[in-house]
Amino acid sequence: MQERQVDIAIIGAGVVGLATALSLAPTGLQIALFDAQPKPSAGPQGTALNDWDRRVTALTPESIRFLKSLAAWSLIEESKRGGAYTDMLVWDSEGTGQIHFTATDLNIDSLGTIVESSLTTQALISATEASSNLSSHWGTRLESMDIEAESVRFTTSSGDTVIADMTIGADGGRSKSRELAGMRTREWRYGQNAIVATVRVQPHHSHACWQAFLPTGPLALLPLANDDLCSIVWSLDDALSDHWIQADHDAFVAGLNRALSGRGPQVLEVSERQMFPLIQCHAVDYYHGRFVLVGDAAHSIHPLAGQGINLGLSDAQTLGNEIVWAHQRGADWCSPQVFSRYERQRKGDNLGMMATMQAFKWGFGSKNPAVTLMRNIGLNSVDALPMAKRWFVQQAVGAK
């Protein structure tokens, strides 16, 4: 057991925690990452159906630019496992409403890139290991935490005590650090789970995403780097998700194809499936003393727009910019003014996206015929109006 002093401690070494550390590295401050899980093994390998990570993220062009600035994107590019997509088709399964987005609507090369979560994590780990002022402590749980006037003191499962000038909570939606800091949240349960898997399709996906809004919840088909493989995210009410996670292979494939109703490619084969609960949670405050929240620890949303990880990366970039700016000018880089600027910039965007997801959930979950009619008219109207369509595309790819 020992006492360790660092400038900045980050609890949680997932994508957002690692990106936050890298965004702060230019300060030269001593930054230590702590994660309860063992260090992940090498990123995904192989191209067979079950070799692909079932958890993927739809990284926007803005997130990709940020990862490039952290020297983390090159490993993803070299792996040739990122699936860039240029088109997105969204439709209402209960009517005729649909929107077709294309990259040309924004005069860009692609709307984003589908990347396995484990690959993004591995790329960021490699980047942190190349930075002399970053250290990572894997398999180290947070046990207790005290927020003091000039520091944050916490103990870990190894028995060590860490004293940090500031601490960042990046440990996910069920954040232990947020709980120990006594920070309040507002939480909504959707009563749904998401089933994720990799599927083989025919014909090839042609670098397009498909999203069907079903009465039971949205189904997304996301193109992977191999042109005959897609990742699925199927959000279903609790009882239905329990049924479909246990369904045999052929029944599940048939269920997917019925849900897609011929709008997307035909699903031929499905990998092993995983399921996780859907919860929306938002911290009332993003900081308390010298403790700050980022990513899902501050806000977690429904995955239907694929924006969760992009919002978290925006948190990491904004907090990093504010601290680096203050440090370069010799100001107090862990002052309430710095943290307040971060919160002010990020809270509005995060709340706006959460409200949009809640509206989509209500609008497409309603069985009221009048609501069904209005949403179909709305979808078709947006598809026919270039300015409105451009705005929706900008929201989908996180463009300003």
What are these regions (language model features)?
Residues 67, 151-273:
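Conserved FAD-binding catalytic core of PHBH/FMO-like flavoproteins
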Residues 242-334:
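FAD/FMN-dependent oxidoreductases across multiple families
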Residues 51-93:
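N-terminal FAD cofactor-binding segment of flavoenzymes
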Residues 6-33:
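N-terminal Rossmann-like FAD-binding beta1-loop-alpha1 element of flavoenzymes
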Residues 3-4, 76-180, 188-193:
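Conserved N-terminal helical subregion
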Residues 25-52:
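Glycine-rich FAD pyrophosphate-binding loop
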Residues 16, 39, 174:
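Conserved Rossmann-like nucleotide-cofactor binding loop
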Residues 321-400:
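C-terminal helical "tail/cap" subdomain of flavin- and related membrane-associated enzymes
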